[in-house]
Amino acid sequence: MVKIKYFGILKPCMPQTEDDGYWHAEKAGVTIGQVLEETEVVGKVENMVILVNKVRKPTDYVLQAGDTMTVMPLVAGG
């Protein structure tokens, strides 16, 4: 089981959430990129920060059981 949470404008892309605000998904063995494609996050924002267990990871990282994945869009101002 992997806990996944999207923030900001990406939050509506989460298929479901539990009471703790996370999507609990059977995604062990799947890459971050595959999760993003499945939930149609790809193309929603140009840049995002992806953390797994509070450490930044690339989209080819393979998720493990017990991981917590957090996805946040980068915000710019001027």
Protein language model regions, located:
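Ubiquitin-like/PB1-type beta-grasp interaction modules and other compact soluble beta-rich domains
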Residues: M1-G77
